[in-house]
Swiss-Prot record:
Coiled-coil residue windows: none
Protein name: Nectin-3-like protein
Predominant cellular place of this UniProt entry's protein: membrane
Cell compartment(s), UniProt: Cell membrane; Cell junction, Adherens junction
Record topology, Cytoplasmic segments: 409-574
Ranges of residues in domain Ig-like C2-type: 151-240, 251-336
Transmembrane segments: 388-408
Lineage of producing organism: Eukaryota, Metazoa, Chordata, Craniata, Vertebrata
Disordered: annotated segments: 442-484, 498-549
Membrane topology according to the record: Single-pass membrane protein
Disulfide linkage: 57-129, 174-228, 273-320
Gene Ontology terms: cellular component: adherens junction; apical junction complex; plasma membrane
Residue spans, topological domain Extracellular: 36-387
Amino acid sequence: MALTMTAHFLRNNPIQLGLNLRVLLMLSFVSGLVYGSQVIVPPKVNAVLGKNVTLSCRVQVDTNLSLTQSSWERKLPNGWVTLAVYNPMFGISIPPDYERRLSFRSPSALDATIMLEDVGFADIGVYTCKVATFPLGNTQASTTVSVLVEPKVYVSAGSSALIDGGNETTVATCIAERARPPADVSWETNLYGMSEAHMQEDANGTTTTQVHYIWQPSRHAQGHTLTCVVKHPALQSDFRIPYIINVQFAPDILVLGYDGDWYVGRENVQLKCRAKANPPAQHFRWIRLDGEMPNGAERVNNTLVFTRPLQKNDSGVYRCEVANDIGLHSRDIRIRIQDPPSTTTMPPTTPVRLLTADISATAPGNKQRALITSPTLAPLHEGSLGTIVGGAVGGALFLLLLLILAGVYYQRQRRTFRGDYYTKQYHGPSDMQKAPQPHELQQVYSKGSPDTKLKSNQDNGTIYPDKDREEWGDFDRERSPNGRSRALREAGQLNHHNHQNHEHGFHSNHHTGHPQSYSPAHHIQRSSLQPQPRRYPAPQVMSNGSPYLPEDCYDNEYVSHTDGSMISRREWYV
């Protein structure tokens, strides 16, 4: 508005242009200084009823400005009321109505914070902090004060006692009384109950909140804890109050003392009745159900004591009755008195030394058990010695049986034929083609059969060395002079030495450059010369590569084995 009026004036009065320009520059400078000061207050402050509250006011002033004074005012229905004034030159001024309750915290050109004590509901309202600077003028900011009422919290028990097995009832009630605003109330527990809340409006805008916990009582929850939890802005932290549940129930009874081994003559025995009850049990009673209480059985509080040795007629059913304010419960127990244990003595034993242990046996008249002492062995129970000896003997017999079986198996393996009964097929290992012993050939060829006589050489009457069957693999390269195996040659030599007085005739047809052939032998007088072996045709290699002779080249169809048995060349053995 000032700038508009100045421009209008300059249009109408151009002569005063220079003076008005100076005025315009001054107004612009003042307008820029408006943004050079600032008052900072919180928008809202919560005060607790009956306690102190702080109203903060910070002043930010530019260096080109100077603080004249700072003050607090309150708006009432009939207008504004000044609460406090601070002037750097004249000091602090507070009206008499607030002189005892209001004060500046630390007055200065930058701080106008005040403190209000003993806040009441009348202090609710809007408060304004004003700052006067030169040449700018006044700057202000307002805050709203609310009064909170801290609740009064307590827990009360239900109207009726908690009886085990009763109906659902109120266990306890958590109350947050006269709170502003209303408090948040709840129960914390591990029981399976439910909460029920009620709220009541009071004067001055406060509220009372009640939360009931409803649950069906059970003796198993005796001693458990409920926790009342209250949350409110006036509280620095959650308010928690524990409540212990008290459930009343009739006695739970437990009878002690009977171990099932009561026998005639046993002494110092008793039956004790223990009861768990709320309230505590006040009455105990022992009775016998199947007859009169025997003589010598006395009732002492909750215990039935037998003051004499047990007798057979003490057997029976006994009952313990326990009562309290809630009810009466009982527990029955059947007692069986057995025959006395036998007193037979153990038979005498002889001392036995086992390893390093010293064992002493009991005497016939001594009731002490065998004592075993050893630095390395723990004492053995009766009968353990026999078990150990029996186990050792059994183990030795088992090892002996294994050795016998191993020997039998080894002997059978040695007598087992490892060759092939099919003599027309060659098998490699040389130990399967061992030459027969002389005494074995003697049994085969000593019967005088013309087909089994040895043939002599027509030329010089000597027996040429020949290769074994193991060497038949190179039969084509080096042929035996007489075409016979070493076994036949050795057999011929044996017959020559053992039968010098017998006559054997050997005839052979020998043609140079033709294959040898043989014919049946004839008996002739035995000369001083050695018998002449007969030449046999050279063995032909079979089409399957076997170096054995054809079947018609052998004198006999049986061949001897190392164990003395005879094996046919033509038969199959299964």
